Amino acid sequence: LDDTFAPMGFRDENGELVGFDIDLAREVFGRNGYEVQFQPIDWSMKETELNSGNIDLIWNGYSITEERKEKVAFTDPYLENRQIIITLADSDISSKSDLAGKKVAVQNGSSTLDAIYKEPEIVESFDGGEPVLFDTNHEAFMDLEAGRVDAVVSDEVLARYYIQQKNPEDYKILEEDFGSE
């Protein structure tokens, strides 16, 4: 589990794992007579962790893609999510084409990364011809706030939660996105 994927799975102020996916997993496993143990992992290594037997399954934030279907078995999805573009409110970025020449942050190993590469002409227009990769979305947002990147592309559920916890007036979510999952 990615323990930085708020509001789905994250650590509260006491260091306890909480969130929608945590509650759902406990309920599903409990109803079936199983005890669940959560294992935070490096998200960019999720398939390696699964294939090596270090974890038994991936519960949260694991989007279904054609490439991933070839590697793992999925259940039915329980959430639809978009890959949205977030900037600071005072940014002049208002469309995907405005990302040209800009530093765009994305979580490494995420389905967001897969989604943006479905539009290679957009990615090639980024500053340096590729996104700036971060281990967590939280780190990407911190660099946005510090002015080290110009935009973040992230799961809508995480981004809206993050923004709501901060000051929503400080951010802008573009109408265009990089697709749904």
Language-model features and meaning:
Residues 1-61, 133:
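Extracytoplasmic small-molecule ligand-binding "clamshell" domains
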Residues 3, 79-87, 156-181:
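Periplasmic-binding protein-like
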Residues 4-6, 43-45, 63-67, 91-93, ...:
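Solvent-exposed loop/turn segments at secondary-structure junctions
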Residues 9-14, 25-34, 112-133, 163-168:
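Ligand-binding cleft/hinge of the Venus flytrap
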Residues 17, 102-109, 134:
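Short beta-strand->loop
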Residues 24-25, 46-49, 140-143, 149, ...:
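Short, hydrophobic alpha-helical packing/hinge segments within bilobed ligand-binding/sensory domains
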Residues 34-35, 51-60, 102-103, 145-158, ...:
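Alpha-to-beta junction loops
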Residues 87-104:
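Flexible hinge/capping segments at coil-to-helix
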